[in-house]
Design a protein with these regions (language model features):
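Signature of N6-adenine DNA methyltransferases within the class I
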Residues: 1-105, 118-123, 133-138, 199-213, ...
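Short secondary-structure capping/turn segments at boundaries of alpha-helices and beta-strands
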Residues: 96, 112-113, 176-177
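Short, flexible beta-strand-to-coil junctions
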Residues: 112-116, 192-196, 217-219
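Short coil/turn segments at secondary-structure boundaries
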Residues: 37, 105-110, 121-126, 157-170
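Catalytic nucleotidyltransferase
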Residues: 128-129, 140
């Protein structure tokens, strides 16, 4: 079977829906391939076309490079209201804690897909890491009080027993990403869902959300 006709980027039929769609016709037909109204020698799975002389870049058939293995990660998935406005976060950074540690250890700038393709939202996030016990998290007074007051009621209502039990932690803490970023000063990040592929450098003090992919390399 083959794709013999396709329209790669069309508006959705319903008014008001911010959606674009691709339309594909495939089967055993031997008719000449047509992509977006133009004749093509072959239509690839990503709806790009080979030229008449067969020259093309067939990305769906590309093989992964060994050098890139274990270098790209999805950020944390919070599944609750751990995110806070930047002004509130910065006010917490100046507050003392019983154990003398700074709130900067658990209050971090946060990045999602919209921050990459639109104006930065100045959103921060409370992040108690991967396995910090509740008793240790509670020593960060203001962040923990917020999470206990705002996040815990949300976590109490979820189906996952582990998320209810560890309500002060993100649902997915992205241990693999954190390990890969250890010792680096910056990482490259891109939105998972975006019309255009944009890559941006961010310092490792920034915590990435599950809406972005993080490349754990700091070299140019």
């Amino acid at each position: 079977t083959r794709i013999f006709e396709a329209w790669s980027d069309e508006p959705w039929v319903n008014d008001g829906a911010a959606v674009r769609v691709s339309l594909v016709a495939f089967g055993d037909s031997q008719k000449e391939a047509v992509l977006d109204g133009a004749t093509a020698a072959h239509i690839h799975a990503d709806l790009t076309a080979a030229s008449a002389d067969g020259d093309s870049m067939d990305l769906p058939s590309a093989k992964p490079l060994l050098a890139n293995k274990a270098s790209c990660f999805v950020g944390t998935s919070k599944k609750a209201s751990f995110d806070i406005p930047g002004d509130l976060a910065r006010s917490w950074l100046a507050l003392p804690n019983p154990h003398g540690q700074s709130n900067a250890e658990v209050v971090k700038p946060w990045i999602n897909g919209s921050d990459l393709v639109k104006a930065p939202s100045d959103t921060w996030i409370v992040d108690f890491g991967v396995e910090r016990p509740q008793a240790e998290a509670a020593l960060f007074d203001a962040p923990f009080e917020y999470v206990q007051r705002v996040v815990k009621p949300e976590k109490d209502a979820v189906r996952s027993e582990s998320e209810r039990r560890k309500w002060w932690l993100h649902a997915r803490t992205a241990l693999d990403m954190r390990k890969a970023l250890t010792g680096t000063e910056r990482f490259m990040v891109t939105s998972i869902v975006a019309k255009h592929r944009v890559w941006v450098w961010r310092p490792t003090i920034v915590l990435a959300s599950h809406a972005v992919c993080v490349v754990a390399r700091a070299d140019d």
